[in-house]
From Swiss-Prot:
One GO CC term on file: ribosome
Its job: Located on the platform of the 30S subunit, it bridges several disparate RNA helices of the 16S rRNA. Forms part of the Shine-Dalgarno cleft in the 70S ribosome.
InterPro entries xref list: Ribosomal_uS11 (IPR001971), Ribosomal_uS11_bac-type (IPR019981), Ribosomal_uS11_sf (IPR036967)
Gene: rpsK
Protein origin, superkingdom: Bacteria
Organism: Azobacteroides pseudotrichonymphae genomovar. CFP2
Pfam families recorded: Ribosomal_S11
Keyword rRNA-binding in annotation: yes
UniProt-listed GO biological process terms: translation
GO molecular function: rRNA binding; structural constituent of ribosome
UniProt family annotation: Belongs to the universal ribosomal protein uS11 family.
Gene3D superfamilies: Ribosomal protein S11 (3.30.420.80)
Origin organism lineage: Bacteria, Pseudomonadati, Bacteroidota, Bacteroidia, Bacteroidales
UniProt keyword annotations, A-Z: Ribonucleoprotein, Ribosomal protein, RNA-binding, rRNA-binding
Protein name: Small ribosomal subunit protein uS11
């Protein structure tokens, strides 16, 4: 006898005109997420999702492509203004914000939320090249 499958109801996310843009830029990858004011994810993208591999993932061009992909989906759903929260030391932070603006979403604020240690964990040792 076959098991009965229960159809799960897809969660509906409310899209407002205003929202939040989160850019997480590490040394290896760039992740761009657009949420509504409650923090529910509307669209997301990363440079790895766009097809970039290895060291090409942390380039300003990869950040532009990821931000453009993420912003187009949010723009089509009706988002027009965002606050940008930028986290991390990587490349492509400014170019991602510029690309979101070029898609047609107005960036009202840019806030740097990079965590700074108060002498916490020991950092990785420097490379000898």
């Amino acid at each position: 006898m076959a098991k009965r499958t229960v159809a799960t109801k897809k969660r509906v996310v409310k899209v407002d005109v205003k929202g939040q843009l989160h850019i997480h830029s590490s040394f290896n990858n760039i992740i761009v997420t657009i949420t509504n004011d409650e923090g529910q994810v509307i669209s997301w993208s990363s440079s790895g999702k766009m097809g970039f591999r290895s060291s090409k993932k942390n380039t300003p061009y990869a950040a532009q492509m990821a931000a453009q992909d993420c912003a187009k989906v949010a723009y089509d759903l009706g988002m027009r203004k965002v606050k940008a929260y930028v986290k991390g030391p990587g490349n492509g932070r400014e170019s991602a914000i510029r690309m979101v603006h070029n898609v047609g979403i107005e960036v009202t604020e840019i806030i740097d939320v990079t965590p700074l240690p108060h002498n916490g964990c020991r950092p990785p040792k420097g490379r000898r090249v």
